[in-house]
Design a protein with these regions (language model features):
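Short, conserved phosphate/pyrophosphate- and ester-handling motifs at nucleotide-, phospho-/glycolipid
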Residues: 38, 157, 279
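Short, solvent-exposed loop/turn elements at beta->coil junctions and helix N-caps
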Residues: 114-121, 182-183, 189-191, 426-429
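Short, acidic/hydrophobic/Gly-rich beta-strand patch recurrent on exposed beta strands
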Residues: 21-26, 139-142, 207, 336
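Extended interfacial segments that mediate partner engagement and assembly in macromolecular machines
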Residues: 58-70, 76-179, 199, 213
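Rossmann-like S-adenosyl-L-methionine
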Residues: 2-8, 17, 211-446
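Short, aliphatic-rich beta-strand segments
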Residues: 194, 200-209, 267-271
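Terminal RNA-binding accessory module
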Residues: 1-74, 349-350, 357
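Hydrophobic beta-strand signal
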Residues: 42-44, 129, 303
Length: 446
């Protein structure tokens, strides 16, 4: 077993799900920060656990051909990116392997990840969320902490996001507005939230620990000057003592409280709390892949759980006979219904409720969809949702996931219910980070 504070020479064999290099030292797995596959290096052990250890590279004897100089001055301090020290080819390899390993090791499935789709790696995020620290700094958190790093320019965000962050900094400095302190639960400013559509228009929301801010008109003016294509500025009230960003009530300070975007040839109205994929171009690839995996011919009934603002629902509605969407966020369901009306899609229905309760209710009422599509949050599906979905006896289940581990766990649960994975693909929705989207098609095996 490796000892803490000792240095060992080791070769990196692969990657963890977070992008750490993996080596074996004295028979134990060691996870090495910013080490690349194939590298021969000296590793300083920082922490030793029962079944693994953590370390960092102190010298590279044989560098990987995939190593590159990070292109961001904040890399290593800001927790936003994980892979800026490796080239794109190796990043895509690591991500595809992450999905493949999870499906095999956790899910017990022999399905192969048939492709990994990728696109533009810079300035792709259409939604940005900047926390504000107690001392009024605006930036992003250090990895696995709530320690704020005052990042001024980010390679992942679109230009309006950086401009809005600069404007908020000027507002804080000019009017001495206190940031929120998570320990004392005092202070006002919690987060800056901005969403930008394909036309370059932005909706800005400032999240506060209270009902109002001092000098609101002046703040709005600063934000509009910095981001001229702003369609609206909204104040979000969040007085909950949790790490949640959104929640509570919203008050429009100026302009509109929604943003409209085009995706897959459809128009979508988006309120602040509506779920919407952050990478527009790769979202289109993701939804086309899900549509392909659904195998629709025009007559099927589809149940879309976790439908958000109805994006996948309406994409599938153009190829199905009837589509039912369910989502727990009321504002998202309102957006979904309005989006269907705007797009002239009449073969969709939307229900607001928890996925477990909605799925159980549909199963009890005898709904028999041909296809069920699920796109859950990172925690995946509850066993109740898996069980209810299986009771409806669909021919196919399309699982869209943002976490390979919970996807694989649920694939194993579905196998116990008689559904096996037959196709899988990965979509690089978040270049530069360890996050990866994936799509799996499951079919009845018994």
């Amino acid at each position: 077993m490796p000892e803490k504070n000792r240095t060992y020479r080791a070769r990196i064999e692969g990657y963890t799900s977070e992008g750490l290099g993996v080596a074996r030292i004295d028979g134990q797995a060691v996870f090495v920060h910013r080490a690349l596959r194939g590298e021969d290096c000296d590793v300083l052990i920082l922490k030793v656990l029962k079944n693994a250890a953590f370390g960092k590279v102190v010298q590279v004897h044989e560098p990987s051909p995939y190593r590159r100089e990070p292109d961001c001055p904040w890399y290593g301090r800001c927790g936003g990116c994980d892979f800026r020290h490796m080239d794109r080819e190796e990043e895509l390899y690591a991500k595809r392997q992450r999905v493949q390993d999870a499906l095999h090791r956790i899910g017990g499935s022999d399905v192969s990840v048939e492709a990994i789709y990728s696109g533009e790696p810079l300035h792709y995020r259409n939604k940005s969320q900047y926390p504000v620290s107690a001392d009024g700094q605006v930036g992003f958190y250090k990895a696995r902490s709530h320690q704020l790093v005052p990042v001024e320019r980010c390679l992942l965000q679109k230009p309006p996001a950086d401009a809005a962050a600069d404007a908020l900094r000027r507002y804080i400095e000019t009017y001495r507005v206190p940031g929120y302190d998570e320990k004392t639960r005092r202070g006002l400013l919690r987060h800056l939230y901005i969403r930008t559509n394909q036309a370059g228009q932005s909706l800005i929301c400032v999240l506060v620990n209270g009902k109002k801010l001092p000098h609101e008109p002046e703040m709005v003016s600063l934000l509009r000057q910095a981001v001229p294509e702003t369609v609206g500025v909204v104040l979000g009230v969040n007085t909950q003592p949790t790490g949640a960003i959104l929640g509570g009530e919203y008050r429009t300070l100026w302009g509109e409280d929604v943003l409209t975007d085009r995706l897959c040839g459809l128009t979508f109205r988006l309120s602040v709390p509506s779920f919407y994929q952050v990478n527009h171009d790769m979202a289109e690839v993701l939804y086309r892949t899900a549509l392909d995996f659904a195998g629709l011919t025009g007559t099927e009934t589809v149940l879309d759980l976790y439908c958000g603002a109805g994006t996948i629902t309406q994409v599938m509605a153009r190829r199905a006979g009837r589509v039912i969407g369910a989502e727990i966020v009321p504002a998202a369901i309102e957006d979904a219904r309005e989006n269907a009306r705007r797009n002239g899609i009449g073969n969709v229905e939307f229900f607001c409720g928890d996925a477990s309760a909605v799925a159980a209710d549909f199963a009890a009422r005898g709904l028999r969809p041909d296809v069920i599509c699920v796109d859950p949050p990172r925690k995946g599906l509850s066993p109740d949702v898996v069980s209810a979905a299986a009771r409806m006896q669909p021919q196919r289940i399309v699982y869209v996931s943002c976490d390979p581990a919970t996807l694989a766990r649920d694939v194993k649960l579905f196998a116990q219910e008689g559904y096996g994975a037959v196709r899988a693909a990965a979509v690089d929705m978040f270049p530069g980070t360890a996050n990866i989207e994936s799509v799996v098609r499951l079919e009845r095996t018994k």
